[in-house]
């Protein structure tokens, strides 16, 4: 099975208009990603406010994304839930709709054991026939995969990658030494992209690339060509943006940044709230200093 989980994957925001999906803005967002040749787009992940979508909205979001993209880049769906039966339903529906792969985290809130985490993903694996990426986000889910559980799950034929949002930079090297060579490791933490890839990673699931896919793509290309000096210079230039995008809960800052640049309305669903005045000004100043334009 072809491993689509590599390179630059944008964790896309979900645009709203009033209290509905803004499908015109979705097209603008996706075309911006395609223009700069990102390697994939994640739809309905954490950045896409997955927990604030109804099942019907989830399906419409995926269907419309696939129609817009029209096979130009891979579309990856988010299938995280603390209810295994519902997560299976998301995975099965994603497969039916035709996405290229999906990503899921361990069940949040209920804190399953490692055996429970394994069984959860085994159930998702059985519900589909498309590539799966594990999603390690312990600050969100309250639990994480042990190295041993990652190894066990990597032996299931369609589980091909791990997105790691942590800051343990020994972990990718540890995992790299125990899993098969074609199991890919990607960081989900913009701030550690170079350090993570130096330790065995092969890609990046980025929040910042919603608005700077061109710069993020250039950074990775410099890195892959061993132009470390230029990659570091780009990374250092983007660090203030990375940090600003997490001064409030993601996706609050990136939604405002996208709005400020004209990609979508600054609509976000409760319990998330709009960015504070201070955050808005910080975002605006960084966008100006980096000369970001859409």
Curated annotation (Swiss-Prot):
NCBIfam families: dapA. Homotetramer; dimer of dimers. GO terms for biological process: diaminopimelate biosynthetic process; glyoxylate catabolic process; lysine biosynthetic process via diaminopimelate. Catalyzes the condensation of (S)-aspartate-beta-semialdehyde [(S)-ASA] and pyruvate to 4-hydroxy-tetrahydrodipicolinate (HTPA). Keywords: Amino-acid biosynthesis, Cytoplasm, Diaminopimelate biosynthesis, Lyase, Lysine biosynthesis, Schiff base. This is 4-hydroxy-tetrahydrodipicolinate synthase. Its main location: cytoplasm. It holds the Pfam family DHDPS. The keyword Metal-binding does not apply. GO terms for molecular function: (R,S)-4-hydroxy-2-oxoglutarate aldolase activity; 4-hydroxy-tetrahydrodipicolinate synthase activity. Pathway: Amino-acid biosynthesis; L-lysine biosynthesis via DAP pathway; (S)-tetrahydrodipicolinate from L-aspartate: step 3/4. Its EC number is 4.3.3.7. It comes from the Bacteria. It catalyses: L-aspartate 4-semialdehyde + pyruvate = (2S,4S)-4-hydroxy-2,3,4,5-tetrahydrodipicolinate + H2O + H(+). The record marks 46, 109 as: Part of a proton relay during catalysis. SMART domains: DHDPS. It is an enzyme of class 4 (lyase). InterPro entries: Aldolase_TIM, DapA, DapA-like, Schiff_base-form_aldolases_AS. It is found in: Cytoplasm. Pyruvate binds at residues 47, 205. It comes from Rickettsia canadensis (strain McKiel). GO terms for cellular component: cytoplasm. The active site is at residues 135, 163. SUPFAM superfamilies: Aldolase (SSF51569).
């Amino acid at each position: 099975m072809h491993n689509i989980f590599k390179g630059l994957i944008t964790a896309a925001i979900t645009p709203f208009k009033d209290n509905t999906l803004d499908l015109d803005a979705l097209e603008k967002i996706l075309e911006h990603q395609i223009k700069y040749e990102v390697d994939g787009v994640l739809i309905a992940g954490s950045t896409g406010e997955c927990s604030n979508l109804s099942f019907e909205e989830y399906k419409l979001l995926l269907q419309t994304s696939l129609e817009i993209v029209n096979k130009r880049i891979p579309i990856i769906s988010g299938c995280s839930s603390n209810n295994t039966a519902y997560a299976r339903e998301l995975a099965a529906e994603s497969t039916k709709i035709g996405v290229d792969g999906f990503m899921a985290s361990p069940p949040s809130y209920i804190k399953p054991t490692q055996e429970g985490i394994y069984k959860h993903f085994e159930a998702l694996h059985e519900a589909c026939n498309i590539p799966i990426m594990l999603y390690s986000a312990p600050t969100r889910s309250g639990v994480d995969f042990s190295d041993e559980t990652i190894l066990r799950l990597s032996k299931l034929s369609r589980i091909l990658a791990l997105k790691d949002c942590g800051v343990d930079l020994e972990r990718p090297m540890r995992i790299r030494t125990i899993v098969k060579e074609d199991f890919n490791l990607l960081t989900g933490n913009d701030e550690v992209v170079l350090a993570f890839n130096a330790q065995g990673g092969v890609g990046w699931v980025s929040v910042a690339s919603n608005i700077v896919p061109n710069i993020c793509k250039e950074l990775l290309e410099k890195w892959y060509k061993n132009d470390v000096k230029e990659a570091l210079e780009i990374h250092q230039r983007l660090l203030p943006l990375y940090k600003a995008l997490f001064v409030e809960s993601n996706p609050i800052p990136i939604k405002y940044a996208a709005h400020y640049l004209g990609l979508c309305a600054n609509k976000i669903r409760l319990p998330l709230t709009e960015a504070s005045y201070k955050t808005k000004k910080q975002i605006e100043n960084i966008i100006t200093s980096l000369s970001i334009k859409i």
